[in-house]
Regions:
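Short coil/turn linking the two alpha-helices of tandem helical-hairpin repeats
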Residues: 14-15, 85, 115, 135, ...
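Extended alpha-helical scaffold segments
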Residues: 177, 185-192, 207
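Core solenoid repeat modules with strong leucine/isoleucine-rich periodicity
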Residues: 194, 198-201, 208, 218-253
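Alpha-helical repeat scaffolds
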Residues: 20-29, 55-66, 87-97, 119-128, ...
Length: 253
């Protein structure tokens, strides 16, 4: 039963970063349990597989452990189904799951991927309005995702579904390159190129100055920003500037 003790010790730690180790211990614990029904070990195994992006394996682990684990892991199952592109099945799993904050997050992601942008935006808006119930840093992620859903609605010609206050970038949208970029995309869809240019510049400046991204990550994030800058410059008649921006993208490839 040493592996079960190791698992309990692992779970007591405030943060588990080594997901391979968590998987190894949990897997051993499920095999060493005399009943073969240690629900904590099975649950830990599923979570570790999700953290390692092994979504098909997570689904197999849930199915193999029986109904008791499946009832406990409805949210994890829905997320794995979503990540493997099984959107209808993911929605069905969420309908059964309790409407926890985590379930709402997954529901919004499923709606976005299924191109139900109005529904996704509604969920993100509700979560944002109750941001005090969430985790530290969650509010910024919600704002990023809400603006992305809003931009998709604008591109689809459904801008009337976006509240007017979300069409006017505020201080919060200027604090992260992702929010500035998504706000810029909304402006592009509405044909407000001058405001889009300002937001894209802010997004690029923030991305280039970010201390959280490595050089390669910055290059990846900057490509769509600069491509949109080139497009905006063209729409504003600044053709030389557009050509220079296009050259930047080509040189970085």
């Amino acid at each position: 039963m040493a592996e079960l003790g190791a698992l309990n010790s692992l779970l007591r730690s405030s943060s588990i970063e080594d997901h391979e180790e968590a998987l190894r211990i949990a897997d051993a614990a499920t095999k060493s349990s005399r009943s073969g029904d240690d629900i904590t070990a099975h649950h830990t195994k599923v979570v570790a597989l999700l953290k390692l992006d092994r979504f098909d394996d997570a689904l197999r682990a849930i199915a193999a452990a029986g109904n008791r684990l499946e009832d406990l892991c409805l949210l994890e199952k829905a997320y794995a189904l979503y990540k493997t592109g099984q959107l209808s099945e993911a929605e069905a799993a969420l309908d059964i799951a309790a409407k926890s904050r985590g379930a709402r997050h997954v529901a919004a992601q499923i709606a976005y991927r299924a191109e139900k942008f109005d529904h996704a935006a509604t969920i993100y808006r509700e979560l944002l309005n109750a941001a005090d119930e969430g985790l530290v840093g969650e509010e910024n992620d919600l704002r990023i995702n809400l603006l992305a859903a809003d931009a998709q609605l604008e591109w689809a010609g459904d801008g009337h579904r976006v509240p007017s206050n979300e069409k006017q970038p505020g201080r919060e949208e200027m604090e992260a390159f992702e929010t500035a970029y998504n706000a810029a995309c909304g402006c592009l869809a509405r044909g407000d190129f001058a405001k889009a240019a300002m937001l894209l510049k802010r997004s690029r400046d923030l991305c280039e100055a970010s201390e959280d991204l490595g050089d390669e990550e910055k290059k990846t994030e900057l490509v769509p920003i600069i491509v949109q800058q080139a497009y905006v410059s063209t729409k504003l008649g600044k053709l030389e500037e557009a050509a220079a921006l296009q050259n930047v993208v080509v040189l970085d490839e």
